Amino acid sequence: MSIEVVKPGLSTTVQDLGRPGYYHLGIPLSGALDQYSCRLANLLVGNDESAAVLECTLLAPELAFTDNAIIAVAGAQATPRINGKDVESNASLAVKAGDTLGFDLMKAGARTYIAVAGGIDVPMVLGSRSTYALGAIGGLHGRKLAAGDRLPVGNPGREARAGRTVDIGLVSSMAKELALRVLPGLYFHRLTESSADTFFADTWTVASEADRIGYRYRRGRALHFLERQQPFGAGSDPSNIVDAGYPYGSIQVPGGLEPIVLLRDAVSGGGYAMIGAVISADMDCIAQMQPNNKARFLLVDMPLALSARAERQQRLVRLRAALAG
């Protein structure tokens, strides 16, 4: 079975849950930016949660099916259409050989996930089918999809069937204004006291430079770092440090001007001070922010971060239970 890419959309890639374990070698996590929506789409079609799906950014693709298949669409609010007719999101759907899947514009959210029963069956690279375009590995030829590509699909499992739905309470909302919870980082103390306050007080806007590597935020007040004699190996700007590792979700502010939250395709280290990190429970939310959406950063402590992670895990438990069988 295969799927033909008629129109690739703005940036459509093959992703699964990622390839942890190689960050120390400079190979990032990759994988779906919105892990929850990826899991939801897979569970709807009876796949293992780790099966490869299509991640579609801002403008979804047009796909033609060469065989009968079971599919599901989750994530951003973009109405799917089979042969031009509106169909449901967050539900498993039957498509027939010769059918075409398309979408309208994403009204809220930035990433839609398309799962096919059997999963997108591209080769595994370092234990994952995820595309890491900067390194040209994984996915389909290590790149985003192009018109004319053919995507191989694995054999559907016994759980594959149309008509499976999920309660709206288990579907992620796509808010256009968010509060992103942040743990202070190793270099938070390098900010002046007033900048530490304004970072959390200001409302920031998602810039157009927002992709799988990182999300840039602007229109808040510039941040100032304490002056110091820069150590050997650090850059000349106070926001520079001697190179250090970058945690997933970490926040750097080059030149003190615009915070950047590093995502799943970010490099593993560099010379900018990490003033904090968005907690893991909120990273899926960033993935669904469109340019010009608004965000506030909210300072939290480790107990709250761990509690939020536990709540997120419980939500996954409820999702699995709702779609079991």
Where would I find each of the regions flagged by the language model?
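Conserved "landmark" site that anchors the functional core of diverse proteins
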Residues: M1-G325
